[in-house]
Amino acid sequence: MTLKKLSYRLAAASALSFFVTSNAFAATEIQWWHAMTGANNEVVDTLAKEFNDSQKDYKITPVFKGTYPETLNAGIAAFRAKQPPAIIQVFDAGSGVMMGAAGAIKPVADVLKEGGYTFNKDEYLAGIVAYYSKPDGTMLSFPYNSSSPILYYNKDIFQKAGLDAANPPKTWPEVFEAAKKIKTSGAAQCGFTSTWLTWIQTENFAAWNNVSYGSNENGLGGTDVKLAVNAPLFVEHFQAIADLAKDGTFRYGGRTSEAKQLFMSGECGILTESSGGLGDIVKTGMNYGIGQLPYYEGHGPQNTIPGGASLWVFGGKSDAEYKGVAEFFHFLSQTKIQSRLHQVSGYMPVTIAAYEETKKSGFYDKNPARETPLLQMMGKPPTENSKGVRLVNLPQVRDIMNEEFEAMLAGKQDAKAALDKIVERGDAAIKQAAGN
């Protein structure tokens, strides 16, 4: 062999060795599709960076995919194209959709077990675990940003309107009267607004007031569900909102979280919104207060049901990716991470240890209202009306509701007509989706 040939072979061997070594030590990339915006998007990026910096084997890559419904639809499309991410954040309404796609997902309990971690559901808050588990108790998804709807109010606007800024309204009639006073006094352009008329004013309204949303325990007992949201209490509530909308005392912001901007801008004095919206409200520097979700005397308060979203794992991934997912979920479960996530975002800690650590630190003593979402959810044992809502097509049913609510708020129909149409259209859609 000539010296020249030997030189070529040594160079080739060296290059091959470098290629193999580089690939052997390359971090396994794990895509995490999510729907977080604003302050909560910053939290996502921070968590990914902290996990990536803590080890060298795996790299979490967060990818923003739009609103909650847009992210779910993107995930479904990616699965059909055989290119899904390893992890996808799915909002509460999409849980039934994911549970119905058994072959598409890998239960998080299995991911953790195969990754070498013992999953003990007793370490997690019971109400949250139950919402994301099969009837046999198998945990299907990882509860990332669980939330509860609460009332926010602008203390400065309350003072201008002659309202007691230290005592937010507790019942819905009190909210409506306060909203009227804010409007008529000129303290703000609008008295009251709400995000998520479906999740807050319908699903949680039913649970918090202990009235039925639908048959079969709101879908938790089976897929054959008949909606019950045209019952008298719903009609009374939505007619009150429709009446307030006529002169702008109630202002509609949109189907999801858009109304939060009406509150943060000072346009509206009262807002019902997810506890997870706290981060953005804090960033405005406004003088805000927090109260529990309002209720009707003689009905509530019972308990709220979790909102927010959980992290689902798609099937068909490599062992290395699943190991990385298990490591990431273990990282997220750490008490210090959960405590911090709760304190900076307003989302609820998913583990009992994180809740107890936050309580022990004195955080709630300094910020008593921040415990409100947890106390609402854990205050009473759930009834068949308040365990949750699980429909195979809940996003579709929410769309139907939003269409009818928007027609109602535009003055095209009253609350009774809107709710009757929701039941008629919703029942037909559920029957078709469930194959009954």
From Swiss-Prot:
Protein's UniProt keywords contain Transport: yes
One GO cellular component, as annotated: periplasmic space
SUPFAM superfamilies, per the entry: Periplasmic binding protein-like II
Binding site for sn-glycerol 3-phosphate: Y68, D92, S147, S274, G308, Y347, R398
InterPro entries given in the database record: Bact_solute-bd_prot1, SBP
Annotated keywords: Periplasm, Signal, Transport
Domain of life assignment: Bacteria
Function: Part of the ABC transporter complex UgpBAEC involved in sn-glycerol-3-phosphate (G3P) import. Binds G3P.
NCBIfam families registered for this protein in UniProt: PRK10974.1 (NF008211)
Similarity field: Belongs to the bacterial solute-binding protein 1 family.
Assembly mode: The complex is composed of two ATP-binding proteins (UgpC), two transmembrane proteins (UgpA and UgpE) and a solute-binding protein (UgpB).
Name by which UniProt lists this protein: sn-glycerol-3-phosphate-binding periplasmic protein UgpB
Organism per entry: Agrobacterium fabrum (strain C58 / ATCC 33970)
Upper taxonomic lineage: Bacteria, Pseudomonadati, Pseudomonadota, Alphaproteobacteria, Hyphomicrobiales
